[in-house]
Design a protein with these regions (language model features):
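Active-site metal-coordination/substrate-binding segment of hydrolases
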Residues: 77-116
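Flexible, glycine/proline-enriched loop segments at strand-loop-helix junctions
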Residues: 33, 37, 116
């Protein structure tokens, strides 16, 4: 489920032929949000909006750290909580002579049929 949030994130559907489609679709949305270290606020906003669309409790703090809560289900409603941790920022580095603005430009994904790797260019 790709969220319909504002501001909308434009994707080129580069990964549509790969599986799992839903996960890679979300990855493509996130790749289109510039998020170098110290510039992850828009990515954090997107995660909060997506979680909220899914009916989850979500909030972002002043440092763009995001907390999403999902209640237990299937008989585990009273189980101890589970915490998963990750990060939204990227370590931004480019080859000499490459013109790319990590503050404003989305990552351009490409998929090559002869490899299972995802590459950016």
């Amino acid at each position: 489920m790709t969220p319909t949030i504002s501001p909308a994130v434009e994707t080129k559907n580069v990964l549509d032929h790969l599986e799992p489609k839903e996960v890679l679709g979300l990855f493509e949305v996130l790749a289109n949000i510039p998020r170098g270290s110290g510039n992850e606020s828009k990515a954090a906003d997107w995660v909060v909006a997506y979680a909220t669309e899914l009916g989850l409790e979500a909030k972002k703090d002043a440092l763009s750290c995001v907390l999403v809560k999902k209640p237990g289900q299937g008989g585990l409603e009273n189980a101890a909580p589970l915490i998963l941790h990750g990060h939204l920022d990227m370590v931004c580095e480019k080859a000499e002579g490459v013109d790319f603005d990590f503050i404003n430009d989305p990552i351009k994904l490409r998929s090559e049929e002869h490899t299972s790797e995802l590459q950016s260019h």
